[in-house]
């Protein structure tokens, strides 16, 4: 009986360990098509590793988050990103960071990070922030939003549409921590309505989504769709 219990325990333990470690790594690109020969590949899911004997402290250092970015644009917003691309020591560590600068009433428009959760920390200013859930059982979506002040922290779950609006009359600054060395970003308006080939009458939308689809979906005329694309160029 004791031998049977021990056997059952070992089987259960082995099954648990298998389930714990038999998971795919987090993707760091939109896709990574496999090749049989390494010399046929142009990208890897991550970066090749530097010889440890050649690593130095500068590989783990980035300078510049003390400098505000230029917010003189239509949105009144700019981001300074720190990822494995400009801080090589982040490679494989699963994190990145960004400084977000806002002009008065500046907006980081609705967007998603397909590969990362974001933690937003307010350094200066007053913000209205929020995220929208994925489709619920009733087909709707729920908004979670708050007003944040200096020192407040808000989290945006991975892949969900979210935004940050500076509702103050002064510039605002925030720091965002992201749970991927390459979180990716999809700005909703640009992805859906941004024109790619204005000369193509029926394929004005990036990435070439038929105008008929959007006219039917939003129940608006093609002229309204075309006007919207022109504002997202």
Swiss-Prot record:
One of its GO terms (molecular function) is manganese ion binding. It comes from the Eukaryota. The keyword Metal-binding applies. Residues 63-215 form the Cupin type-1 domain. Expressed at high levels in unstressed roots. PANTHER family: GERMIN-LIKE PROTEIN SUBFAMILY 3 MEMBER 3. This is Germin-like protein. It comes from Mesembryanthemum crystallinum.
